[in-house]
Amino acid sequence: MKYIRKIPATDKEVSTKLVADGWIKLKEPSNLGVSILISVPFMIINGIIFAIIAYYLYPPLKELFNINNDLSITFTVNLVTFLYVIMFFIFMTIHEFLHASFIPKAFSSDKVYWGINGFVGFVYTTEKIKKGRYLIISVMPFILLSMILPFILSILGWLNWFTLFLCLMNAMGSSVDFLNMCLIAVQVPRGSEIINNGFETYFR
């Protein structure tokens, strides 16, 4: 697995060869910006799912819904704030490595890449992946970091506003993953293989 700064551009020659070999292009957004915009409904749904989990795990959260209490938010920038920012990027990196860990032989493959472009992390591969495996790769960071991790943190006594925030950002940030899952689930027949070429996805 290698580090890259951004997802490679689509190679038109590779696209032509894939089509000639019987691969079918997936109908999908043309770039990440459009994908994020279209995935907003998933962002909201994922956020609600996590909020329900957090509501029952973290009692102080219930106070936000108590109309008899005044809500006061104070934000202070100091050294701890910068540590929080660093932890946020570490958490985002963990999200991407969880994607990668479910790609067969990802850490020894020269066809698997990861990176962070601005505030958006990504894992990219040109390996052929079965549909079922692709869906697992896509959903696992959400399940592990936004559904299972809060329970573990609660048991350990480490569940607080900041760890809740990290889990929430992971849940909402998984929206593009869920969009891709829906596109794959609807368009790709069972048992098919999937391959990426830049921002284009093909199946056969």
Describe these PLM feature segments:
Residues S72-V77, H95-F97, Y124-T126, L156-L159:
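Short amphipathic alpha-helical segments, especially helix-boundary/capping motifs
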Residues H99-V112, Q187:
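Catalytic Zn2+-binding segment of zinc metalloproteases
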Residues M1-P59, G118-R204:
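Metalloprotease/metallohydrolase-associated module, dominated by Zn2+-dependent proteases
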Residues P60-V77:
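Perimembrane loop-to-helix junctions flanking transmembrane segments
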Residues E63-N66, M87, E96, A100, ...:
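Short acidic/polar alpha-helix capping motifs at helix-coil junctions
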